[in-house]
Amino acid sequence: MTGNSIRMGPQSFRRNLALLFIGIVTASVSGAQTGDTSDSEIPYSRKGADTCLACHDDQLSLAIFRTKHAVPSDPRSPFGHGQLQCEACHGPGGAHSPRVRRGQERPSVIEFGSHEETEVSVQNDNCLNCHNTGVGFGWHGSSHDDDEVACADCHVSHAPRDAVMHTSTQPDVCFDCHQLQRSETLKAFSHPFFEGKMDCSGCHSPHGATADAQLVRQTINDTCYQCHAEKRGPYVWEHAPAAEECTLCHSPHGSNHPGMLTSRAPLLCQSCHSQSGHPSIAYDADGLATGMPSQYLLGQSCMNCHEQVHGSNHPSGSKLMR
């Protein structure tokens, strides 16, 4: 002994080393027996995407290399320098990739789609790890989130052309679930969805919004005014229903009446203007002095005279006739 130090002989050193080894092995076996294998302990594969592509070499899997998710020069991409490649989205594959013995089941990784084993919340949280600003900012608490819609139900991350991201194909993706709205767009008068000139996200924010029906603007009218700016006003003579809400008179997805009206005039007008003696009351030929059909039943009915139905700036336009 020299000072406070202890000199250990060769035999003592070997004995202590053996005891340490036994302790490590015992702890490892104990951990295995208790099933202590949390996700954080699952190793990543040693060769990254090369390991995955040894099996997943079909066209759907390889298509990822033609998307923004696999751009080596973009540090934000899962395939950017130093990133985890396939495992950035699908999770650690160290337990999934090794060869399994006959009769054993290969441990799964994160799979995407509402019909997969992975919980939808886990799938979506994985997407939000990157898409956590902009479109993903209002996701939590949105109607799609509450209904457990998976990101992969609408988006195809491996597709070079994601259908929901393009105006001409987006409505068909939305209509897979929103079938009532699809039926309305097939009526005689509708917005130009099937002409590829308009998509659902022009009015609705699919990733969440504070407005009703997840509108992109706070009110129905402000949403409509994005395209129909000439109806905004302000007018000297306002038509109260038009200023209150466009959908009081119009069906936004489609209608069998011109102008996408909820019903034809004069019936639409009479839902408000029904007081006794008002000229908008529809008379048949028998109720008229001339015995001829009423002008209020022909053509645009009330709008033959009251043509400025959204409002008028004319000094004498109080009746919306000019």
Q: What is each residue range found by the language model?
A:
Residues 16-28:
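Bacterial N-terminal signal peptides
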